[in-house]
């Protein structure tokens, strides 16, 4: 367990060297939400409020896709991935640490800030809290799914489009359940089944992703 947290701490130190790049996802979200609000300012306020959760979810999904390439890229460039394969016994543990640190640095800030933005833009606090819960479950799931695509395409120089093609269809269930839960909360309908389905998907990929990534990295680096 100590080695796991040591690996996460190492990832944080490496990410801190990138400076403002860590803040880019939050800046993207802020810009998207501002432009969204300006572009439909002529629409009825109630309609805008109903659309806010969907817009947040779509923004988070696209930002997650943009960040996927960075999960293994630096380790691939400096040769650390070769050490992962040599130290095969702990490869899955190292991969999980890398995915978790990527999520904490890239997607967790979005999950925290997005509901605050929706409250500022007029969404009620209860619905914003449900939005936060769905993002807290959905964004790590997207990182787990995306890590598989990133591992499969790591040896390709321009892999962003290919990664997007692979992961976007797999993100659809998360998007459906996430937006449905928030929408149900807005209209005071039970959203428990949607949250349960999101948790099940998360647990499935929490088990599958480390194994799939290790196999994909071995194939890509062969």
Residue ranges with predicted function:
Residues 31, 96-121, 141, 145, ...:
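Hydrophobic alpha-helical transmembrane segments that constitute the membrane-spanning cores
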Residues 145-148, 173-185:
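Transmembrane alpha-helical segments of integral membrane proteins
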Residues 206-222:
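Junction motif at the cytosolic side of a transmembrane helix
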Residues 39-51, 115-136, 182-195:
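Membrane-interfacial helix-loop-helix connectors in multipass membrane proteins
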